[in-house]
């Protein structure tokens, strides 16, 4: 069972929360454009990856199945970028603390599971889009 989502503190907060997207975010679109420009158009979006036994692992933002490369484009706020050290919202602190802990733990599990079946995992943080995408291009050139 999931956590109970608290009521938004105002209609404006509600509208902001409803507008948050989980796929095809601005940072994802930037990375995809950089990959196409660099000559790497053959990726899959939100491609399901299973273990050999069929157990579901995850759907990375971008995958190169033939190369076994999984790419996650993480927003600094939602995935708790270690460099940005974003503040936790002041209202509903318990809820947000638990949510962020679960997000970070889920990210760790995905990465560990993918590496366990031979995938290379590359995480690009929102605050480092250009550098992260450039590093990814170098990995793909190998």
Task: Describe each region flagged by the PLM.
Residues 1-142:
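Nucleic-acid endo/exonuclease domains
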């Amino acid at each position: 069972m999931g956590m109970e989502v608290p009521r938004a503190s105002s209609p404006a907060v509600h509208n902001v929360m409803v507008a948050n997207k989980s796929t095809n975010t601005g940072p994802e679109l930037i990375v995809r454009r950089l990959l196409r420009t660099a000559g790497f158009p053959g990726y899959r979006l939100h491609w399901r990856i299973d273990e050999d036994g069929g157990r579901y692992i995850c759907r990375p933002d971008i995958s190169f199945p033939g190369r076994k490369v999984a790419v996650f484009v993480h927003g600094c706020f939602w995935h708790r970028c270690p460099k940005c050290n974003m503040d936790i919202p002041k209202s509903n602190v318990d809820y947000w603390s638990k949510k962020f802990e679960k997000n970070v733990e889920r990210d760790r599990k995905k990465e560990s599971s993918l590496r366990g079946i031979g995938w290379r995992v590359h995480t690009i943080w929102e605050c480092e889009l250009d550098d992260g995408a450039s590093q990814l291009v170098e990995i793909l050139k190998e």
